Structures are given as C-alpha cells and as structure tokens.
Amino acid sequence: MRRQRSAVPILALLALLALLALIVGLGASGCAWKPPTTRPSPPNTCKDSDGPTADTVRQAIAAVPIVVPGSKWVEITRGHTRNCRLHWVQIIPTIASQSTPQQLLFFDRNIPLGSPTRNPKPYITVLPAGDDTVTVQYQWQIGSDQECCPTGIGTVRFHIGSDGKLEALGSIPHQ
C-alpha cells in the first residue's frame, strides 16, 4: 500500500513564502528609507526670440582671441536663466583636448555682455540655471593631476547687475 503525502508541509511552505514576500514588499514599497526626490524643473517658457540672434552670437565668438593656432571657436552648448533674460553660449576651439581652454559668452537677451574671465579656462561646466542666475563650475589641475581628472573645483554664480553688466556673485575660482 502506498502512503499519501500530507499537503500540510506544502501549505506551510507556501504560507511562509507568502509572508516573506509581504515583508519584503512592504520594505520596498514604503516602510524603508528612500532617497529624497528632487523637485522637477519648471517647464522652459523661453522663446528663441528671447535670446541672442545667430548674428549676435557669431559676432561675439569672432571677437574672442584664438588660443589654439590653426583652430577657430565653435559653439558646443548654450542655455539661459528661467526668466529668459540672461543667456550663455559655451565655445571651444576646433582643435581641442580634455584640458583645452574654453570660454563662456553671456548675453542680456540680444545684447552681448562678454565673458566673465579675461582668459579662457579648461573644464567649464554650466550647472542648472536659476530664475536670474547662471552657476558656473570651474575645475583645474592641481599638482600631478592627470588631464582627465582635475581635482581643483569651485563655482560662482553670475547675474545681470543693476548697471546692466554681467556680475559675479562671489569670486571666480582659480584666477
């Protein structure tokens, strides 16, 4: 005669697995720590007509002295503040490496404001803009830093001053 197996151990195992899944599910869904969420950026309401024209940008770029012989400046990116007034264009030489100096050009809508630094700087990053400020991160090599990995870092915010000129809100790092 063949013995029948009891369903009790199988049911107990299934109940244990269900309980474990419930515990893990609660931990993953709301009882465990979650990293803080960032507020989404407001939608971009600026129009092309709020910024510099192509001709204004072309003239501003042409006025920047060439730093790499045999190359010319080209635009690599641009942006603006959320109030659509302060615009920036980042330029780099056509012959460049990771550490080739770059330049930022600022505009009050279609009026050129120039660059915040007299000389181009390598490793420039423009961070997400504020309502009326642009934050620029400058990096530089220190000691035996490799070209890929500068360890010097600092930021400064820029806005249009009451006189209509570009104004740094703090000192520009590594001048």
From Swiss-Prot:
Intracellular or extracellular location(s): Cell membrane
- GO cellular component assignments: plasma membrane
Instruction: Tell me what topology the record assigns in the membrane.
Output: Lipid-anchor
Does this entry carry the keyword Cytoplasm?
no
Q: Locate the lipid attachment (N-palmitoyl cysteine).
A: C31
Sections of the chain in a coiled coil: none
What are the alphabetically sorted keywords of the record?
Answer: Cell membrane, Lipoprotein, Membrane, Palmitate, Signal
Q: Which InterPro entries match?
A: LppP/LprE
Pfam families per UniProt: Lipoprotein_21
Question: What name has this protein been given in UniProt?
Answer: Putative lipoprotein LppP
For whether the record's keyword set contains Ion transport, the answer is no
S-diacylglycerol cysteine lipidation: where? C31
Indicate the principal place this protein occupies in or around the cell.
Answer: membrane
Signal peptide, first to last residue: 1-30
Organism this protein belongs to: Mycobacterium bovis (strain ATCC BAA-935 / AF2122/97)
